[in-house]
Amino acid sequence: MLLVSLLRVAARYWRGQRPYVEDMERIVRYMRRRRERGLSAVPSSLVERMQGLGQSNPNRLVGLQMRKLRRTVEYVYRYVPFYYEAMDAQGVKPTDIRSLADVHKLPITRREQLAENPEAFISRYPGLVATTTAQTGGTTGKPLQVYLTTEELHYYAAGEALTGLMMGWLGPAEIFQTHFTVDEAIESIVLTRAAHKAGTLVLTFGTTGTLDDHVESIFRERHIPGKKPKVSWLMASPSHLWALTRQAEEMGVDFRDSGLQRITTGGAMVSEDLKQRVMETWGIPLIEGYGLTETLTCAAGQCGKSERMHFTDVTGYAEVLDPQTEEPVPPGQPGVLTITTFYPDRELMPLLRYWTDDLVILSPDRTCACGLPTTQILDIVGRADHMVKVGLQAFYPQEIGDSLLAFPELVMPPRFTLRTEQREDAQYAIVDVELSASLSPEESEPLRQRIADGIVLSRYWQVKIGAVKLVVNLRPAGSLEHPFAYKHRHLVLAQRNE
C-alpha cells in the first residue's frame, strides 16, 4: 500500500491534482516508524528519486503551472461569485487564458475587497464545507477572515509533516515549544497539527508565564521515554525571541547547553541585527521564508544552498508589478508581489492575482545549487502602502525598523512614526521613536545620535548625500499616535546544521 500511495502522490502531483490526504498520511506514518527505529525518514534510494522529481527541468514546471492556471481560472469563474462578476466586468472568459503570459488579463484582487466581503470569495462547489477560519494579524489594516475546509487543513498539515520528517526537524523524538497560541495564526494551526502527525511533543506556552519560566523550559532536561532530553524546536515572535535571548543572557545560562536545532519566528519583520544576534548567541544560522495567511499554500523559503528564497511555483504563480502602473517589472527590480493560488491546492478560497502590497525583488536567474528551477526572491524591500516620499526620494519604514531593533533602550518591537517636512535649507525625514524607559538629558542625546547614525534610509532608492536630512526624536512609551509597529508577514527560521 505504501508504494501505491507514493506512486499515486507523484502521479497526481504532475497531473496538477491535489494528492489524497490518506496517501500523504500513510507516507507520514511510514516515515515516523522509520524515525522511531533510528533510521532516516526516507531510504537513500528513494531520496535520490524524489530529488530527481524536484529538480525537474523548467519547461516541465512551466507546463504544470499552465495547466493549473487554466484549471484555476475555469474553477473560480464557475464557482466563486466575486471572480465571475469581476471577469465579466473586464470582458475576460476562461478560454482567453492560453498561456502564463495571459495572466495580466485577469482582475487584480485587492486586500480591501477581501476585507469588505470575504464570503464572496468562497467557492460554491457542491459539497465544500467551511469548518475553520484563520485570521490575519491585522498588522497592515483590518484583520481578514480566511476560510478553510477540514480536508484542506489536513492536507496542509500532512504536507508540513512530510517536509519536517524528511528534513529532520519533526519526528517522534523531537520536542517543539511554541509561544504562539494554537489558534493565533494559520502557521501555528498547521505546524502544531503537523507536529502531532509526526509524533512530536508540543509544549504550548502562548504568552503565559514569565520569561524565566520560558527560558527554563528551553534549557530544562526532561526524561520522557523516546524523546530528546531538551527542546529541539522553538517558535516565538521576533520581539519575544529578543526578550528570551536577553533573559537567558541575564540568567547566565550556557547557550551551548541548549538542545535547540531550529528556531521559527513570524508575525513580524526580522532585522539583520536580530538574525546576527541569534547566530552569535544561539549558534544557529537563520533560514528565511515568506508567507501570508491569505495565500497560505503559496510561500517562499530558502533551500540552504543560497540566500534566495524559492517560491512554491507548483501551488501558485508569482508576479512582480509596478506599484503605480500595475505593469510587470523585470527581475532584479523592486515591485509589488502579486500571487495567484492554484486550484485544487486551494479549493475553498482560491485567489487571482492577490496584491500583497509587499515590495520584493525577484532574481533574474532561476538556477540554484539545490537544483530547483523555481521563481526566487532576492529580497523583501518593504510595504508599497507604507512608502513615504520626500521630494523624489522614496523611504520605507521597514528599512528604519531594521536599524531600530539594534537599540535595547527602545520599545520592542520598535514603535515609531516617519514624517516629512520641507524647510528652507533642505528636505527633512523626521523619525519619532518610543523609549522603553525614561532617560536623563545626558543619556538621551548620545542615544539619539547613535540611532540617527544607525538608521539606514532607502536601500534600493539611492538618496543623494545632503539631499535629505534626518532628525530623530525620542518619545515616552505609548505617546505616539498611529505608530508603525514594525510588523510584517514574514517568516524566518533558524536551523542548526548537523
Description of each model-found segment:
Residues Q261, V270-R366:
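Conserved AMP-binding/adenylate-forming
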Residues V76, T136-T139, F176, L234, ...:
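Conserved S/T- and glycine-rich ATP-binding loop of Class I adenylate-forming
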Residues L234, D345-V463:
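AMP-binding/adenylate-forming catalytic core of the ANL superfamily
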Residues F176-T178, T338, D432:
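Short, well-ordered beta-strand segments
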Residues D213, K227-K275, P285-T293:
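Adenylate-forming
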Residues M1-Q135, G141-Y155, L162, M166, ...:
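Nucleotide 5′-phosphate-binding alpha/beta core
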